[in-house]
Swiss-Prot record:
Belongs to the New World alphaviruses that can cause fatal encephalitis. Structural polyprotein: Translated from a subgenomic RNA synthesized during togavirus replication. It comes from Venezuelan equine encephalitis virus (strain Mena II) (VEEV). This is Structural polyprotein. The keyword Lipid biosynthesis does not apply. Residues 896-913 are annotated as: E1 fusion peptide loop. Residues 275-700, 757-771, 812-1224 are extracellular.
Length: 1254
């Protein structure tokens, strides 16, 4: 490849010291014979150690032990080491090895670092269990005990361990026994610590995540049961019992240990035991191992197909199918030659509804088309075959087809496939073809050979299926990775099958000819032909292998020649007739099935976000139609789900509980509003009104309306009283001629006196004529002075309105409290115990899991309609056999006239009958693309807590059930039960594509056609399938062999189109929904009761802690409704330096610090969070209390990306300034009313006194 010789790295030259080396001290020389004995003993021990693993060599090339031994034996002497080095050097200088296998060099995979480490540790601690000379599983020695899987039969390959008497633990599928004392020093250690990450076992790395051990698919198989899984320190974390394939990975069934050292078994659904049990098959009432059949296909093809048919339901069918393709003595083919089983089949001709001109019998008839992947690929099933030559040998990029009984081939690049535009053919194997096609409403396949064009078209809507939340039409170059389903580009065995059977007889008129007055039949070479003739009154029916002449008949129309072949299978197509008698069925693997993968999805441009007061504005400009989903993070999610196709602006309200939006394939974004608003709660009246109007618009409007009504009422009442008093006062003087009104009365009633008098003269007149009015006049200033004094007192001495959210009581040795179930929000409290210093307790929940108990009812997927080849009886009647398959329909049609490519099938015209059968089964892609219907029951709650008690911190996993305690540092903690038995999951839930939906699905066995659950199976691999698809058979068209039918569309596909957003986007309280296992995390609902049992050792005597002699608290800065936006400075004088707990007994403020360091004199800074505008709280430091109070200002940011750390149930107080202005307003209104009342009283007294005097 390169024009220059490759350069290999040279060995570095040794460093030469320019100074002479010191002489080595002399030691007495050891006996060479004794050294050789020690070396031989060490070598023998190493061989004994590794001999236990010779039956199962590791992955990679076998070790060249023989060459090494011979070289050592040939040069074994006192200078043996030098000889070995010379031999190695000679090997390097020898000629390079010649390439074999057509120039392909086999790449040997060497064991990795993990495998080498496990092999080294397993060598003398893991022992194979032998059964019939084969390794059936393994036993390992862990912690002084021998563990072996209960399901593994056989004898341990160790004399000491095999003689031990074991005890059975069927619950854990284990047998165990105590190992002898002499072996306990060299055993595995075990651990319950299993942080998420990667561990090691015999085959490499094991991933541990969400409580599950998984390995890549194909790593590990039967025979690995009992192998240990080790951590980096060589400790056993689990023992493997089995596994189950889940897409691209295999989930392991293991036995492990929990924190208490109790054995726990975890088994995934549909898990298989990995003991190497030999599966037996049957041939003529004789059993044999499925992997060792007595016959093979190349030698006895017909008998082999019969054997496969009789074992079609055997669990070892795949082993038998693989074994019959390899006859003993034949060389093994390359591992790249996959799916050799299709040499058991042959192509066929079938009717195509739309050829170049009308319908025809086409060699490339299209049977089925599927395009369910997310990569734009289409999988076709045709009557032609791919990857095989006419003789049945593997030949890549080749198509073979049946042309009137003759199998021909054509290069695959000469075959065209197109929809609206040409397709790109990826590969083909067997009856299946994989291609990438543009969108279109039909698909056409054609090729041309010898100036003849063969084509076939079928109606099928081909379109690109995007994955994710953006409806793109072409895969992007860059973006995010998401799980998806794609068609595998190889032909590996992935558990999907297609049904085969022996073909029926095919009429071939080309085999008939006339010679004189007789009919001549010429069978093809190596084939048998069934001849049926009706010549006059003579009926002939026989099978011939060579040419034969029938003189009884003179016309070819009197005879039918049927091709018969019992050594090849064909697809069980409705376009082919069924063979007479018992049909030998089989099944072969389907290539190019759907698999799980990672697809690149586009990311829509990020929205332009504008924050407002309790609102968010999103300016969206998508490139593709993109979904926008929003929800509130409280009990009422009020979610929205909208497909945005054009640039738009959407406005949403945000509350203190939180709001979340998901834009396309971007991760969710959450926002919380803060209690911010324009204006100033401590400013002038208009600023106060503006502030409260934005925060509480309805309450502010109502309050202002009430104040305005009070002021208006007071003014109106005062005016009315004044007018009434004036009229009552002036009326007597108006009726008296030349009456003179006193001066004081004229002033009160706003009337002009008859003559001008001084104040003294007026008082003298009242004293002489009306003393009651005199004293009333003197009381008016006194009343005004009293009112002014009381008003001033009310204005200056207003008590602010504070709401106390609650107090946290402190117990003693046994402490109980309640913590809000909100992740990330710290909860601080203290324990006050007589004679001891307060003990601070801080708890921060990092994760809270709600795991429901679920029961899988069934799985549903896209169904596949299976149609048996129609059974045609010429000139006779038939009856349907009993039906036993899902939704199977059977119907007999009379008066059919079938016709094949070789001519008419029957002699009769109207007496022929046809049995049509159709049924429903799971699609080949059901293993990957399916939905699971669960019933959910009581949920368990698991909390991950960061706990600090005093100076001791730990991380604990607590089951919130009120029963299961957790011990750490002597502290015993019991949590739960949760204050509310709430769950986001309904009684019926559906899991699809890693997401959970609340859906009321029909019960098992009660599905409806065209709805979810129209096809049901207990598990993916179970055979008990129920279906209801409204399958109705129709009468076949005359002149064609086919099975027409009508059927309801797939309810599963319709549900996928109509399904609402999953719980991931709609769950209340901000729950995060996950699968494997199904769970909800971090739901901010309810509270968690906690009970602490604290030992005496964690308490500190009061005498050993500092005490404060003086303390003064000042609020330096305070921003309410913000995360620790308050800063308090406490100046103190302490008895000595030390550490003290700080706490606020009330819920007015939440402290960031749980303890502070104190000096003998100084100040401490404490951060707090509050929702109060004018906070006033008592701060406990050690055993002393100090009061902190001040004014808080609103936060500057309207929206933040994190929740508030204070109690959200706390309602903010009305500021002191607002109360001052409010009381002033009400006080002014009261003065007006009081003045009116005083005037009315004075006038009334005067009128009454005057009338009495007169």
């Amino acid at each position: 490849m390169f024009p220059y010789q490759p350069m290999y790295p040279m060995q570095p030259m040794p460093f030469r010291n320019p100074f002479a080396a010191p002489r080595r001290p002399w030691f007495p020389r050891t006996d060479p014979f004794l050294a050789m004995q020690v070396q031989e003993l060490a070598r023998s021990m190493a061989n004994l150690t590794f001999k236990q693993r010779r039956d199962v060599p590791p992955e990679g090339p076998p070790a060249k032990k023989k060459k090494k031994d011979t070289s050592q034996q040939g040069g074994r002497n006192q200078n043996g080491k030098k000889k070995n080095k010379l031999v190695k050097k000679k090997k390097k200088t020898g000629p390079p090895p010649q390439k074999t296998n057509g120039g392909k060099k086999k790449v040997n995979k060497k064991p990795g670092k993990r495998q080498r480490m496990v092999m080294k540790l397993e060598s003398d601690k893991t022992f194979p269990i032998m059964l019939d000379g084969r390794i059936n599983g393994y036993a390992c020695v862990v912690g002084g005990k021998l563990f072996r899987p209960l399901h593994v039969e056989g004898k341990i390959d160790n004399d000491v361990l095999s003689s031990l008497k074991t005890k059975k633990a069927s619950k854990y599928d284990l047998e165990y026994a105590d190992v002898p004392q002499s072996m306990r020093a060299d055993t595995f250690k075990y651990t319950h610590e299993k942080p998420q990450g990667y561990y090691s076992w015999h085959h490499g790395a094991v991933q541990y995540e969400n409580g599950r051990f998984t390995v890549p698919k194909g790593v590990g198989a039967k025979g690995d049961s009992g192998r240990p899984i080790l951590d980096n320190q060589g400790r056993v974390v689990a023992i493997v019992l089995g596994g189950v394939n889940e897409g691209s990975r295999t989930a392991l069934s293991v036995v492990t240990w929990n924190e208490k050292g109790v054995t726990v078994k975890y088994t995934p659904e549909n898990s298989e035991q990995w003991s190497l049990v030999t599966t037996m098959c049957l041939l003529a009432n004789v059993t044999f191992p499925c992997s060792q059949p007595p016959i093979c296909y190349d030698r006895k093809p017909a008998e082999t197909l019969s054997m496969l048919s009789h074992n079609i339901d055997n669990p070892g069918y795949d082993e038998l199918l693989e074994a019959v393709l390899k006859c003993p003595g034949r060389g093994k083919r390359s591992t790249e030659e996959l799916f050799k089983e299709y040499k058991l089949t042959r192509p066929y001709m079938a009717r195509c509804i739309r050829c170049a001109v009308g319908s025809c019998h086409s060699p490339i008839a299209i049977e089925a088309v599927r395009s369910e992947g997310h990569d734009g690929y289409v999988r076709l099933q045709t009557s032609s075959q791919y990857g095989l030559d006419p003789s049945g040998n593997l030949k890549g990029r080749t198509m073979r087809y049946d042309m009137h009984g003759t199998i021909e081939e054509i290069p695959l690049h000469q075959v065209s496939l197109h929809t609206s535009r040409p397709c790109h053919i990826i590969d083909g194997h067997g009856y299946f073809l994989l291609a990438r096609c543009p969108a279109g409403d039909s698909i056409t396949m054609e090729f041309k050979k010898e100036s003849v064009t063969h084509s076939c078209s079928v109606p099928y809507e081909v379109k690109f299926n995007p994955v994710g939340r953006e409806l793109y039409t072409h895969p992007p170059e860059h973006g995010a990775e998401q799980p998806c389903h794609v068609y595998a580009h190889d032909a590996q065995n992935r558990g999907a099958y297609v049904e085969m059977h022996l073909p029926g007889s095919e009429v071939d008129s080309t085999l008939l000819s006339t010679s004189g007055s007789s009919v001549h039949v010429t069978p093809p070479a190596g084939q048998s032909v069934l001849v049926e003739c009706e010549c006059g009154g003579t009926k002939i029916s026989e099978t011939i292998n060579s040419a034969k002449q029938y003189s009884q008949c003179s016309k070819t129309a009197q005879c039918r020649a049927y091709r018969t072949q019992n050594d090849k299978w064909v697809y069980n197509s409705d376009k082919l007739p069924k063979a007479a008698g018992e049909t030998l069925k089989g099944k072969l693997h389907v290539p190019f099935v759907l698999t799980e993968a990672k697809c690149t999805v586009p990311l829509a441009p990020e929205p332009i976000i504008t924050f407002g007061f309790r609102s968010v504005s999103l300016k969206l400009h998508p490139k593709n139609p993109t979904f926008l989903t929003t929800r509130q993070l409280d009990g009422e999610p009020a979610y929205t789900h909208e497909l945005i196709t054009n640039p738009v602006v959407r406005n949403f309200s945000v509350t203190e509980k939180g709001w979340e939006f998901v834009w396309g394939n971007h991760p969710p974004q959450r926002y919380w509003s803060q209690e911010t608003a324009p204006g100033n709660p401590h400013g002038l009246p208009h600023e106060v009104i503006t502030h409260y109007y934005h925060r509480y618009p309805m309450s502010t409007i109502l309050g202002l309306s009430i104040c305005a009504a009070i002021v208006t009422t007071s003014i109106a009442a005062s005016v009315w009283l004044f007018c009434k008093s004036r009229i009552s006062c002036l009326t007597p003087y108006r009726l008296t001629p030349n009456a003179r009104m006193p001066l004081c009365l004229a002033v009160l009633c706003c009337a002009r006196t008859a003559r001008a008098e001084t104040t003294w003269e007026s008082l003298d007149h009242l004293w002489n004529h009306n003393q009651q009015m005199f004293w009333s006049q003197l009381l008016i200033p006194l009343a005004a002075l009293i009112v002014a004094t009381r008003l001033l007192k009310c204005v200056c001495c207003v008590v602010p309105f504070l709401v106390v959210a609650g107090a946290v009581g402190a117990g003693a040795y046994e402490h109980a409290t309640t913590m809000p179930n909100q992740v990330g929000i710290p909860y601080n409290t203290i324990v006050n115990r007589a004679g001891y210093a307060p003990l601070p307790i801080s708890i921060v929940p990092t994760k809270v899991k709600l795991i429901p108990t679920v029961n899988l009812e069934y799985i549903t997927c896209h169904y596949k309609t299976g149609m048996d080849s129609p059974a045609i009886k010429c000139c006779g009647t038939q009856e349907c056999s009993p039906t036993y398959r899902p939704d199977e329909q059977c119907k007999v049609f009379s008066g059919v006239y079938p016709f094949m490519w070789g001519g008419a099938y029957c002699f009769c015209d109207t007496e022929n009958t046809q049995i049509s059968k159709a049924y429903v089964t799971k699609s080949e892609d059901c293993v990957t693309d399916h939905a699971q219907a669960y019933k959910a029951h009581t949920a368990s709650v698991q909390a991950f807590l960061n706990i600090t008690v005093g100076g001791h911190s730990t991380t604990a996993v607590v089951y919130v059930n009120g029963e299961t305690p957790v011990n750490f540092n002597g502290v015993k903690l019991t949590a739960g039960p949760l204050s509310t038995a709430w769950s986001p999951f309904d009684k019926k839930i559906v899991q699809y594509a890693g997401e959970i939906y609340n859906y009321d699905f029909p019960e098992y066995g009660a599905g409806h056609a065209g709805a979810f659950g129209d096809i049901q199976a207990r598990t993916i691999s179970s055979s008990d399938v129920y279906a209801n698809t409204n399958l109705v058979l129709q009468r076949p068209k005359a002149g064609a062999i086919h099975v027409p039918y009508t059927q309801a569309p797939s309810g599963y596909e319709q549900w996928k189109k109509d399904k609402p957003p999953s719980l991931k986007f709609t769950a209340p309280f901000g729950c995060e929904i996950y699968t494997n296992p199904i769970r909800a995390e971090n739901c901010a609902v309810g509270s968690i009761p906690l009970a602490f049992d604290i030992p005496d050792a964690l308490f500190t005597r009061v005498s050993e802690t500092p005490t404060l002699s003086t303390a003064e608290c000042t609020l330096n800065e305070c921003v309410y409704s913000s995360d620790f936006g308050g800063i308090a400075t406490v100046k103190y004088s302490a008895s000595k330096s030390g550490k003290c707990a700080v706490h606020v007994p009330s819920g007015t403020a939440t402290l960031k610090e749980a303890a502070v360091e104190l000096a003998e004199q100084g100040s401490a800074t404490i951060h707090f969070s509050t929702a109060s505008i004018h906070p006033e709280f008592r701060l406990q430091i050690c055993t002393s209390y100090v009061t902190c109070k001040g004014d808080c200002h609103p936060p500057k940011d309207h929206i933040v990306t994190h929740p508030q750390y204070h109690a959200q149930s706390f309602t903010a107080a009305v500021s002191k300034t607002a109360w001052t202005w409010l009381t002033s307003l009400l006080g002014g209104s009261a003065i007006i009313i009081i003045i009116g009342l005083v005037l009315a009283t004075i006038v009334a007294m005067y009128v009454l006194t005057n009338q009495k005097h007169n």
